[in-house]
């Protein structure tokens, strides 16, 4: 099963990604440095994230899954640094600092 998922962090920010294997243990490849800046050492001692499956398919090609991932990133605005941790696709030429 191929899936598009959303990870929600304790601060409410999100990360949208794809998993072509539907691994229960896969939580994406968001930039750890971006996430670490948003949490103190104390907050990191007790840290929970939520993973939601937004879309799934047994028949979609890998390129269809990639297109669906971009669709969800744009719809949920997870590439807006105020909302999420996706760094791609870029929003209006913005670069994460």
Task: Please annotate each region the language model reported.
Residues 1-97:
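Structure-specific nucleic-acid interaction/processing domains
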